[in-house]
């Protein structure tokens, strides 16, 4: 039996951006649903975070979600199982008030998706799988008990485990220890958007790009085989972020093909700019010959030297969070620096979801 796996779909991402909504459905319309139909896959497990914002979703995004995603699952007669993720819940201490129960309904009112607010063992073609939703203060004891006693070799959930990559160069240092799932042959999880697989725990990664931290990180969905207990990765060919390094020392940008930059968020990194007129002509082409969602030009790094961060820290840092964490470590203050780092990280992630102009 083949089971399609989705996770961290985050419908309504980037403040209900229409740009990202259209980009998401390119994947569903051209990759996901056609693959399920061609391969006669009739079961879907969603491993949490089906929507993006915990408090609300706008009418247009909700309309598209119902008619272009949920109704299509029903029309294709896909047996759908949805785990509650942390972005799906209104309160942080319970899964009971969630977007899934409100939005994920079937047109006939009968063949509703299976929704998991609490852990449950479900049999798929003779294979028992423990379905583990987001663990919160209300269900924690029950979840941990099920992780220790459930009659299942495979676990699928929405876990916050330490030691795994949340995004590029950012490793989770908090959360539950991996040992809580050590008794399972394999654990598949949503929550972190970058693929992580240590051989026993597999964070599947998101299906598409949502922030610049997803850039150059292969996206797609997975198909689980209950007989072999292996997963197959189906690539999503669509991207929305693209970088262009400008160096006119040995390249003529008047002849540069900009087709691949259409309908993209672009970072234009200026390495060497000797011909200012050619650079301006390139900008003119990017703005007028194609449709660019956003163009950021990066060419002045002088402001970095004016910070209080030492040169060795700045040179050794791989990303924004690493830079900030190293800076916090150098602060001569009597504070809980680990707690401060967590607060900064949460603010950084929230800032990445700032509104995108449609």
Residue ranges and their predicted role:
Residues 226-358:
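Accessory, non-catalytic peripheral segments of nucleic-acid enzymes
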Residues 8, 44, 49, 65, ...:
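Divalent metal-coordination and catalytic microenvironments
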Residues 167-233:
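Conserved beta-sheet core of the metallophosphoesterase superfamily
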Residues 9, 13-120, 180-184:
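Core catalytic region of metal-dependent phosphoesterases/phosphodiesterases
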Residues 10-14, 52-55, 82-93, 122, ...:
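Active-site environment of divalent metal-dependent phosphoester hydrolases
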């Amino acid at each position: 039996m083949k089971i399609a796996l989705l996770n961290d779909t985050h419908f309504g991402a980037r403040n209900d951006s229409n740009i990202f909504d259209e980009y998401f459905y390119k994947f569903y319309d051209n990759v996901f649903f056609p693959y399920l139909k061609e391969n006669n896959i009739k079961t879907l497990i969603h491993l949490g975070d089906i929507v993006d914002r915990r408090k609300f979703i706008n009418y247009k995004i909700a309309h598209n979600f119902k008619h272009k995603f949920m109704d299509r699952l029903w029309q294709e007669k896909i047996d759908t199982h949805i785990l509650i993720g942390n972005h799906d819940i209104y309160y942080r201490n319970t899964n009971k008030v969630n977007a899934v129960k409100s939005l994920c309904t079937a047109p006939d009112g009968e063949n509703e998706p299976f929704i998991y607010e609490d852990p449950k063992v479900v049999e798929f073609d003779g294979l028992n799988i423990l379905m583990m939703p987001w663990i919160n203060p209300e269900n924690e004891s029950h979840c941990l008990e099920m992780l220790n006693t459930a009659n299942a070799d495979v676990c699928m959930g929405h876990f916050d485990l330490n030691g795994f990559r949340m995004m590029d160069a950012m490793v989770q240092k908090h959360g539950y220890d991996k040992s809580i799932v050590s008794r399972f042959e394999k654990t598949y999880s949503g929550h972190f958007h970058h693929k992580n697989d240590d051989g026993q725990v597999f964070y599947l990664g998101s299906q598409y790009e949502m922030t610049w931290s997803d850039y150059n990180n292969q996206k797609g969905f997975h198909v689980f085989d209950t007989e072999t207990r292996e997963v197959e990765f189906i690539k999503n060919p669509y991207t929305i972020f693209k970088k262009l390094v400008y160096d006119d020392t040995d390249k003529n940008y008047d002849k540069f093909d900009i087709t691949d930059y259409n309908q993209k968020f672009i970072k234009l990194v200026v390495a060497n700019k000797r011909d200012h007129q050619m650079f301006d002509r390139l900008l003119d082409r990017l703005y007028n010959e194609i449709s660019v969602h956003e163009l950021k030009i990066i060419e002045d790094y002088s402001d970095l030297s004016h910070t209080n961060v030492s040169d060795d820290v700045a040179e050794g840092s791989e990303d924004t969070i690493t830079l900030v964490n190293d800076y916090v470590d150098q602060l001569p203050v009597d504070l809980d620096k680990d707690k401060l780092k967590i607060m900064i990280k949460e603010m950084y992630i929230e800032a990445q979801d700032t509104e995108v102009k449609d």
